[in-house]
């Protein structure tokens, strides 16, 4: 039995988002192939994702020094650490997001901050940082109005972050071009799902 963690980073629903529509179909197909696997979902728009702000940074520093922190800081720090541990416990990760202004939603960045933890997911070496997260798989699904073929900053950001952490098994599927040619929207979606089906054969 494997643990699958889905990170949902879109505030709309599947009727209004090609990315979430693809996620729904992915979940159905994945569950039929791996009925024993455990699936957890983090919705970065609905769940509590602590922002890496001044109170949280101060709480992190105080905790390392063994100093007291406020109940509010303890709650935020506890949630932050829980998200890190949830990520580490997962065998497979699915990240689903739109491309907004050539970037990912800021809420997704906040979640990504929780998985970049020195000493847990990477360490500092004499020649640079070393990723500590090995043997996990990533599937990144992103919807784009235009066609970027993975060269947009958001896609590159996701890929580089997970490579930095040590991931080697990375797949990216882009549902893109619907705004450029709305008449081809269904064809574009079906082509993306065909790619996802192919990935599922070994995912």
Curated annotation (Swiss-Prot):
Cofactor-binding details, from the entry: Binds 1 FMN per subunit.
Pfam families: Flavodoxin_2
InterPro entries assigned to the protein according to its UniProt record, in alphabetical order: Flavodoxin_fold (IPR003680), Flavoprotein-like_sf (IPR029039), FMN-dep_NADH:Q_OxRdtase_AzoR1 (IPR050104), NADH:quinone_OxRdtase_FMN_depd (IPR023048)
Assigned keywords, A-Z: Flavoprotein, FMN, NAD, Oxidoreductase
Positions annotated to bind FMN: 143-146
Transferase in keyword set: no
EC number: 1.6.5.-, 1.7.1.17
Cofactor: FMN
Reactions performed catalytically: 2 a quinone + NADH + H(+) = 2 a 1,4-benzosemiquinone + NAD(+); N,N-dimethyl-1,4-phenylenediamine + anthranilate + 2 NAD(+) = 2-(4-dimethylaminophenyl)diazenylbenzoate + 2 NADH + 2 H(+)
MF (Gene Ontology): electron transfer activity; FMN binding; oxidoreductase activity, acting on NAD(P)H as acceptor; oxidoreductase activity, acting on NAD(P)H, quinone or similar compound as acceptor
Coiled-coil spans in chain: none
Family: Belongs to the azoreductase type 1 family.
Protein function: Quinone reductase that provides resistance to thiol-specific stress caused by electrophilic quinones.
UniProt subunit comment: Homodimer.
Name of the protein this chain belongs to: FMN-dependent NADH:quinone oxidoreductase
Species name: Streptococcus suis (strain 98HAH33)
